[in-house]
Design a protein with these regions (language model features):
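Catalytic machinery of carbohydrate-active enzymes
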Residues: 1-340
Length: 340
């Protein structure tokens, strides 16, 4: 069986419970997974899975390379879990008898031309549950959600070495998503972080190595009254899950780290206005999310969120300004009330 999901970090994290469901039902099954480069680094070592890496920059030549790497094998089933045009075209280079794709409401970019079966059309569900339903045409049901991400012991050792075990509670801040319009203002992050420090918490900034992430972290640090530990750009994708597991609470917009933290059992204070947390928020627990999606729909679309197509993004300039510092502080205090 072959899985096709190239990106992004959060979405491939959502695929892992499906892998666990397939493996639990059919223990001998060997899965091939065509995946993106960075996403492969995150999930490398996932037991029972043979990864075939596809570089999005490689175009048709890279697609031919995937076919060569598959060695001429024809799969009983291809689970085509990405509807973007590039992924649809890539799927044509993967020989398979059953080609299972998304329902019509989630399809786009000619997705239906590359598949011969569809998952059930179930509106109003989380992205993880939609991905989990890819096992249903195979006669299975994803009743249990289990991740167990492949994190090496050295990654946990690295995370433990970043700050002392002194009993101080730790709030992680991962301020950047893959789309700049989902990001919250640095000065608002700083205000929430200062509130946490005033409450006795340690604040740790984390993120990748892009210029935007560095600039955002610097702006947060400059606006804070208190010091914070700056780990932005200092971890690897293998160390990231261990780092997120070490924190007690993660503050982040809709982002890959949100879903990785959730998979590692860390609670998330999600900042939502551009996207619907019921669809793409932290899967296990959304009690500490700020949800201004309906306010965004009314402001920028002139209608309530429940009248929009499920999954509609409201990525407009200024949309995240609907999330106030007071909203985030209230969510933080909600967490403190529930967890002592």
């Amino acid at each position: 069986m072959c899985l096709l999901r190239l990106s992004a970090l959060g979405d491939v994290t959502h695929v892992v419970p499906l892998v666990r469901t397939l493996q639990a039902a059919w223990p001998p099954v060997r899965l091939a997974w065509v995946i993106g480069k960075g996403e492969h680094r995150l999930l490398d070592g996932l037991a029972g899975v043979d990864f075939i890496e596809y570089d999005k920059r490689s175009g048709i030549a890279g697609m031919r390379g995937v076919r060569r790497e598959l060695g001429g094998q024809r799969f009983d089933a291809l689970l085509q879990m990405q509807v973007a045009a590039r992924a649809n075209l890539l799927s044509a280079f993967i020989p398979a008898r059953r080609r299972i794709g998304y329902d019509r409401s989630r399809s786009k970019d000619g997705h239906g031309l590359f598949i011969n079966e569809r998952i059930p059309d179930r509106p109003g569900i989380h992205v993880l549950d939609a991905i989990g339903s890819f096992c249903e045409p195979l006669g299975l049901k994803q009743d249990t959600v289990r991740w167990d991400l492949p994190v090496p012991a050295e990654a946990f050792d690295w995370a433990r070495a970043q700050w002392p075990d002194d009993g101080r509670r730790t709030m992680l801040v991962s301020p950047c998503s893959s789309h700049v319009l989902r990001n919250w203002r640095p000065e608002r992050h700083a205000a929430l972080a200062d509130h946490a420090v005033d409450a006795g918490w340690r604040v740790v900034l984390c993120g990748g190595r892009t210029a935007l992430e560095r600039e955002t972290a610097d702006a947060i640090l400059a606006a804070m009254k208190h010091p914070a530990l700056d780990l932005v750009g200092k971890d690897t994708l293998k160390q990231l899950p261990a780092l997120l597991a070490r924190g007690e609470l993660l503050v982040t917009p809709d982002s890959g780290p949100m879903h990785i933290a959730n998979a590692m059992g860390t609670k998330v204070l999600g900042l939502h206005a551009a996207s619907n947390p019921a669809r793409s928020g932290p899967y296990s627990d959304r009690r500490y999310c700020v949800d201004r999606y309906d306010a965004a729909a009314r402001r920028f679309r002139g209608k309530s969120a429940d009248t929009l197509k499920w999954g509609a993004k409201i990525e407009h300039e200024g949309v995240m300004d609907l999330v106030t510092v007071e909203d985030a502080v209230a969510a933080f205090e909600r967490y403190r009330r529930d967890h002592g």
